[in-house]
Amino acid sequence: MENVQDFIISILRANPSLRDTRSFLASFGPRPTKLFQEQQSQDIIIPPPPSTPPASTTATPTIPIQPTPSPVITSILNPVYNRTALVKIQGPFTDVQLDSITRGLVYLSKLGLVSVIVVDNDNQPRGDQDERRVIIDEVMRVVSSLEKHGARARPITGAIVRLGPKPGSEDPTSELDFTPPETHTLPPDLTPLRSALRAGEIPVVSPFALDSFCRSVRVDSNDVIAGLSADAPSDFSKEVELAPFRLMIINRHGGIPSYARSGYPHLLINLSSEYQHIHETFREEWRHTHPSALSNLALARTCLAYMPPTSSAIMVSHKSPSSLIGNLITNKPAVSSSLPHALLQGNQRLTPHTPTLLRRGLPVQVFHSVSDIDKIKLNALLEQSFGRKLDSASFYARLEKKLDFVIVAGDYVGAAIVTNEDDPVSGKPISYLDKFAVLPSHQGDGTVDFLWVALHDETYGLGHPFSANPNGGKGGKGEGRDLVWRSRSKNPVNKWYFDRSSGHLRMGSWVLFWCDAEKRLKIEEGRRGSAGLSYVEDWEEGRLRTWAEAVSGIPSSWM
């Protein structure tokens, strides 16, 4: 009963939105009956873990045929669709720690995510005469711990990957932006995995590989996981859903430390635009406190390159196993990376054990001239996002005069347009967020957070060292400026804006939002010391009236 309550509480803590729930059900909910009937001869549905058998058994009465199928029959014809996750358990762990980890993995299996676990032991030296025995013992510990929580698990102590490139494959290294796996698989190698998943068991894999002489040798667990992620979709997805849906790295150190968060972990990483920058800003002391962080970062980039675009990787400490459930349901970081820094650090939302979520992500670019913009693609983005027809002629005529910069995510799947509006009082331009748009197909996949973080770095967060991101913008150099924007009072996105803004002002059918320049606030707080900031500072006097007047005079961009 205690485990059931813990399971339910873990789900409730995820606090999924309506979009999160729909996305989860689309991945794990019942499959259409017609589709299931057509594919049942070739698809293998991974059964859920067995429930505890009843104390006594009785003969099941014959169920008469009814015109309307009963819920039981309907559930049989429409089973919950199970997916697989590649899970790296990077020990060593104590029995108590391992118990916490495996409990979380069993909870995931109840929700439809079946783990393919690869075990590793950082403290076991390579080449030790007892290494094979120690590794196999560790595999058996994991199996026993899983079974203790009611799951069925199968140890796989033989090699299921082979060293070297796959026969017949070309060397694509020069064309890739990630390091390809140093291992590969052949269809017969994964018979143990297929068999375990078919039987409803969680496979627990040893980090062994076959060399060119067909000898089983110990390899890094990253090589096993990368090899599985690269070959599983093409070889096994038709027979069993082995194509990995998530990558989970469970270790003793937690996520990847960030220089922007005083050594606390990154919350969300856009691998396409941040990978090299993380390497460049990784401090020397972290190589001792988080020795496997960069190798796990490389593993995530390799695996996600082969996984579906909606997939993600999570790097989590053994102290935060419940966060795995939240990640599965929402596919989001534990805390949004676009929230204000003061809010994240002021109420202890961030801890050394906060997990890091990693996505393949999208490149982010900053343009300062209208001539650099692809107008056709930007038009399509704005019209799909807002559901309205853009008045292109007047819109771009205004940008020619007022544009400060445009941030573009990927191939125009998201954009933030900032203009310089006239301030009649001070004469200094007002930074105005004219448009913030993300394609509906990319809402919920992290693009919104990637875009807002870049917007922060170019406007109200400018001047901080952590705003020096390589996206073609100001590189963190300059003075931050207040950012202002408006939104319809009935816009459902306003709740998201409330969380990220410094304040808001209702203006009839509109709401005016703003974000204060963070560096100026920091300087003022330091100048006043323990007295803190007053309710209304001198430099705040009259600015809301000025902003409201300037924003109210901006013409509509729509037909």
Curated annotation (Swiss-Prot):
Transmembrane annotation, as ranges: none
Domain N-acetyltransferase: 362-538
Cell compartments where the protein resides: Mitochondrion
Keywords noted in UniProt: Acyltransferase, Amino-acid biosynthesis, Mitochondrion, Transferase, Transit peptide
Similarity-based family: Belongs to the acetyltransferase family.
PANTHER family, alphabetized: AMINO-ACID ACETYLTRANSFERASE, MITOCHONDRIAL, N-ACETYLGLUTAMATE SYNTHASE
Role this protein plays: N-acetylglutamate synthase involved in arginine biosynthesis.
Protein name listed in UniProt: Amino-acid acetyltransferase, mitochondrial
Gene: ARG2
